[in-house]
């Protein structure tokens, strides 16, 4: 569907199907925002964080998450006055209506989505809300759920491409191929649906994470910088000091990353950033975002 074009004419929409009112700016979106900006692509973000009208699946009692919250007399995070004052206000518009408008107005060539188990259904639900006439884009799913449940994810009609594992190098390669009209079905890390077939490629070795750009969170709302912690609200930014983990906690995906990378690349996934790089990153983030934590 893609004809050769200039980078600025390639339009990427990043969909962030975040847990409701969990103010957090992920490393992945910040890194890709920096990569896409450096490459000259046109990009935008749809952040689900501040919407109130999520459509939760019913639990065994037949209650939605919001109904359960009322039943248990617990208070949602957006009732924190201090957070509201600092810009973390919930949106009163419809999440589906706003997403459809974003797609119709921005007209993306590619929609990029990172999902875990708890955000997969929201992402698919939003894509399903887009009228057929406006679905002139391809979708690319990544993240933990897409990596470990790729056979399930790729069968969904709203999914065209899956990036397993680390995404920076493979996704940039895929974008370059889409722009140039090149062959994409042999791109490492990718599971791709096309011509009635599914093409599954092996992982490539992990990159030197000291070369990853410093995250760019400019597309996020100012309130996303603030997080409640121990009864107070702080201006914060996240920092990636290492990627993966050498330990084998059973509740975490990191041991699995080491296993699949060892099997497919003969190297483990875990890597650390250098002290020099970390100092550069700290200095930049402190100057730009002035975090308290």
Mark where each language-model region is.
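N-terminal [4Fe-4S]-dependent radical SAM core
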Residues: 2-8, 12, 187, 193-241
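Nucleotide-activated donor-dependent transferases that construct or modify glycoconjugates
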Residues: 10-21
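Glycine- and acidic-residue-enriched helix-capping/strand-helix junction motifs
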Residues: 20-29
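Glycine-rich beta-alpha loop elements in corrinoid/cobalamin-binding modules
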Residues: 28, 32-35, 42-54, 85-205
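Conserved C-terminal portion of the radical SAM core fold
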Residues: 38, 52, 110, 140, ...
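Short glycine/proline-rich turn/loop motifs
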Residues: 78-81, 105-107, 257-266
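Radical SAM [4Fe-4S] cluster-binding motif and immediate context
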Residues: 210-293
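Glycine-rich, highly charged phosphate/nucleotide-binding loops
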Residues: 57-103
């Amino acid at each position: 569907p893609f004809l050769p074009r200039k980078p600025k004419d390639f339009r990427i929409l990043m969909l962030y199907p975040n847990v409701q009112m969990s103010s957090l700016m992920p490393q992945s979106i910040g890194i890709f925002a920096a990569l896409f900006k450096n490459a000259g692509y046109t990009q935008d973000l749809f952040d689900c964080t501040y919407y109130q009208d999520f459509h939760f699946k019913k639990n065994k009692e037949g209650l939605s998450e919001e109904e359960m919250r009322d039943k248990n007399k617990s208070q949602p995070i957006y009732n924190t006055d201090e957070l509201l004052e600092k810009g973390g206000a919930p949106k009163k518009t419809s999440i589906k209506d706003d997403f459809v408008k974003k797609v119709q107005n921005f007209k993306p060539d590619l929609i990029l989505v990172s999902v875990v188990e708890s955000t997969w259904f929201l992402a698919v639900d939003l894509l399903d809300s887009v009228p057929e006439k406006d679905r002139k884009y391809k979708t690319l799913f990544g993240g933990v759920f897409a990596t470990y449940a790729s056979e399930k994810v790729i069968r969904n009609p709203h999914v065209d491409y899956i990036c397993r594992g680390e995404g920076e190098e493979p996704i940039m390669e895929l974008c370059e191929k889409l722009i140039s009209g090149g062959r994409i079905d042999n791109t490492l890390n990718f599971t791709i649906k096309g011509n009635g077939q599914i093409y599954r490629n092996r992982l490539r070795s992990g990159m030197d994470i000291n070369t990853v750009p410093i995250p760019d969170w400019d597309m996020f709302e100012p309130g996303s910088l603030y997080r409640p912690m121990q009864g107070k609200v702080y201006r914060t930014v996240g920092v990636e000091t290492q990627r993966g983990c050498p330990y084998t906690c059973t509740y975490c995906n990191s041991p699995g990353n080491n296993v699949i990378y060892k099997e497919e690349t003969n190297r483990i996934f875990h890597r650390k950033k250098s002290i020099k790089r970390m100092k550069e990153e700290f200095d930049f983030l402190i100057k730009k975002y002035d975090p308290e934590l």
